[in-house]
Structures are given as structure tokens and as C-alpha cells.
Amino acid sequence: MARSPEILADNLFFPEGPRWRTGPTPKLWFSDILAGKVMTVDLAGSVETLADVPESPSGLGWWPDGRLVVVSVNDGKLMSVSAGTSK
């Protein structure tokens, strides 16, 4: 018998590239390409927007120091995000 999936977050436009991060507050990180946002969802289901990336955020990664790296597809940029800002 197939299992029914559990909804972790809804009202998203085009969620992409989920990445799990452990730590004091484990979260699933993902891009919402059409909304232009990098977001997280925690184990309790709380969704948070971490960065606005208007030109379609896609792949995510991290520098060794913990800063987020985001691919911005439409403008061909690789961006670093720290403390709520993108550059």
C-alpha cells in the first residue's frame, strides 16, 4: 500500500532544490523560483523567507563559514547571502 505524503508547506509557486541543514534548529532550505525567494521550513512546519532573489533563485549551497550561496538563474549570477542580505 502506498503512503500518503504529508504537506510540509503550501501556497508556494515553484519550490525547488530542497537541502537539509542540521544544527541547533534543523531546517529544510529551498528556493521558490517563481516567487523569487529562498525559504526554510522547520520540523514544526514554520516557514521563513531568508532572502529575496527576484531573478529566479535555484540551486543552494554554503561557504565553509556558513554563508548561503544562491544561483540566480535569470541574470546569471552566483550570490552570497548573509544575515538577511544578498550581494
Please provide the spans of the model-predicted regions.
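Sequence-structural signature of mature extracellular/luminal beta-sheet repeat domains
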Residues: 1-87
